[in-house]
C-alpha cells in the first residue's frame, strides 16, 4: 500500500511540474488549428470571389477601366489566341504579335469579323533577341495601349535532362520566356503610367510553384516571370497599373503535344478557350492566380507539399511523358 501511495505522490508531483508544458502545448495546438482553419476559410473565400462572383454579379468593364487597345504576344495559337478572343468579346481592340505572318493575318481577320473590333498585327520572332523589338516599337508608336498580355513562351520538345538541351534551346528559352516580357513591359508601361491606368498580364506556369526537375530551365524561367510580375505589381500599383501573374497547370494546347495525355482536354487539362474564359474574369481581382478554379485547388496543394514530394512526383510524371515522346519519335 505504501508503494502505491508513493507512486501516486510521485505522479502528482510530475503532473504538477509538467502542467506548464501541457498548457503550452495546448496553446500551440489551438493556435495551429485556428491558423489552418483561417487559411481554409480565406482560400475558400478567394476561390468564390475569383471564380464564382464575377459570373454572378457581372464582370468589370475592361475598356473603361484599362483602355481600348490590348497587345497580346504569342497570339496565333493556344492561350494567347483564346485570351485575345476573350478581350475582343468585351470590346477591346487587339494587336497581335507572333512570328508567322500567315497565322497573324488569319487570326486578325477572324477576330475582327467575329467580334467587330479593330485588329492589327506585328510580325516578330522573340527568339532573335534584341532585333525583334524595333519593329514592335514602330508598330506600337502613338498607340494608347491599355492591356499587355505577355503570353509568348517556349516549352521543351519534351521533358528532358538539362545536359541534353542544346545551347540554342537555352538561349531561345531565355529570349522568349524572360527577355520578351521585360522588353514588352519596358515598351508599353511608360504610356500606361502617363494615363495612370493599365493592366499587364504575364503568363507564368505552375512549374514555378516548386523546383521542377526535367523542366529545369522552363520552370526557372517561369519562376522569374512570376517574381517579376509580383514585384512590378507593388512597384506600380500606386500609379494605377494592375499587374497579374497567371500560373496555370497543364492546358491542352499544341505546346504540350509531346504527350497524348496532356494534349487532350480532360477534367484537369482544360482547353485554351475554357481556360481563357475563366482567367480573364480574374483580371483586376488577383495579382497572382492559376486563373482556373481546378488549377487553383491543384496549386494550393502543390505549394503545401514538401519539396521532395513535389520533385519526385514531377520527375516521375516527366519521365513518363519523355518515354512516350521518344517512343513516338522512334516510330
UniProtKB/Swiss-Prot annotation:
Assigned keywords, A-Z: Lipid biosynthesis, Lipid metabolism, Mitochondrion, NADP, Oxidoreductase, Steroid biosynthesis
InterPro entries xref list: 17-beta-HSD3-like, NAD(P)-bd_dom_sf, SDR_fam
Subcellular location: Mitochondrion
Active site: 218 (proton acceptor)
Top-rank lineage group of the source organism: Eukaryota
ATP-binding listed as a keyword: no
Example GO molecular function: oxidoreductase activity
Keyword Disulfide bond tagged: no
Region (Required for mitochondria translocation): 2-82
Binding positions (substrate): 205
Location, primary (coarse class): mitochondrion
E.C. number: 1.1.1.-
First-tier enzyme category under EC: oxidoreductase
Recorded GO CC terms: endoplasmic reticulum; mitochondrion
UniProt GO BP: fatty acid elongation; steroid biosynthetic process
Binding sites annotated in the UniProt record for NADP(+): 74-80, 125, 222
CDD domains hit by this protein: 17beta-HSD1_like_SDR_c
Pfam families for this protein: adh_short
Family: Belongs to the short-chain dehydrogenases/reductases (SDR) family. 17-beta-HSD 3 subfamily.
Function: May catalyze the metabolism of steroid hormones and thus play an important role in sex differentiation, the emergence and maintenance of the secondary sexual characters, and the regulation of endocrine.
Descriptive protein name: Hydroxysteroid dehydrogenase-like protein 1
Species, as recorded: Gallus gallus
Amino acid at each position: 500500500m505504501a508503494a502505491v501511495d508513493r507512486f501516486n505522490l510521485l505522479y502528482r508531483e510530475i503532473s504538477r511540474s509538467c502542467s506548464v508544458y501541457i498548457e503550452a502545448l495546448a496553446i500551440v495546438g489551438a493556435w495551429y488549428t485556428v491558423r489552418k482553419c483561417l487559411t481554409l476559410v480565406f482560400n475558400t473565400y478567394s476561390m468564390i470571389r475569383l471564380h464564382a462572383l464575377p459570373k454572378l454579379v457581372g464582370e468589370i468593364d475592361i475598356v473603361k477601366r484599362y483602355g481600348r487597345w490590348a497587345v497580346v504576344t504569342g497570339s496565333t495559337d493556344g492561350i494567347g489566341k483564346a485570351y485575345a478572343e476573350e478581350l475582343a468579346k468585351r470590346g477591346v481592340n487587339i494587336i497581335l504579335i507572333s512570328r508567322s505572318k500567315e497565322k497573324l493575318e488569319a487570326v486578325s481577320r477572324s477576330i475582327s469579323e467575329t467580334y467587330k473590333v479593330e485588329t492589327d498585327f506585328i510580325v516578330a520572332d522573340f527568339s532573335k533577341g534584341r532585333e525583334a523589338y524595333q519593329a514592335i516599337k514602330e508598330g506600337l508608336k502613338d498607340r494608347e495601349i491599355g492591356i499587355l498580355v505577355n503570353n509568348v513562351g517556349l516549352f521543351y520538345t519534351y521533358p528532358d535532362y538539362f545536359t541534353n538541351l542544346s545551347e540554342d534551346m537555352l538561349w531561345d528559352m531565355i529570349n522568349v520566356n524572360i527577355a520578351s516580357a521585360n522588353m514588352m513591359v519596358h515598351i508599353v508601361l511608360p504610356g500606361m503610367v502617363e494615363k495612370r491606368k493599365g493592366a499587364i498580364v504575364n503568363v507564368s506556369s505552375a512549374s514555378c510553384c516548386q523546383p521542377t526537375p526535367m523542366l529545369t530551365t522552363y520552370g526557372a524561367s517561369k519562376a522569374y516571370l512570376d517574381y517579376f510580375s509580383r514585384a512590378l505589381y507593388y512597384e506600380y500599383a500606386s500609379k494605377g497599373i494592375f499587374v497579374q501573374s497567371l500560373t496555370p497547370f497543364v492546358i491542352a494546347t499544341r505546346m504540350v503535344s509531346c504527350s497524348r495525355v496532356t494534349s487532350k482536354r480532360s477534367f484537369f487539362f482544360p482547353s485554351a478557350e475554357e481556360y481563357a474564359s475563366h482567367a480573364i474574369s480574374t483580371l483586376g481581382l488577383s495579382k497572382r492566380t492559376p486563373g482556373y478554379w481546378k488549377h487553383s485547388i491543384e496549386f494550393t496543394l502543390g505549394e503545401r507539399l514538401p519539396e521532395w514530394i513535389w520533385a519526385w512526383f514531377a520527375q516521375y510524371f516527366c519521365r513518363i511523358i519523355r518515354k512516350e515522346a521518344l517512343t513516338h519519335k522512334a516510330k
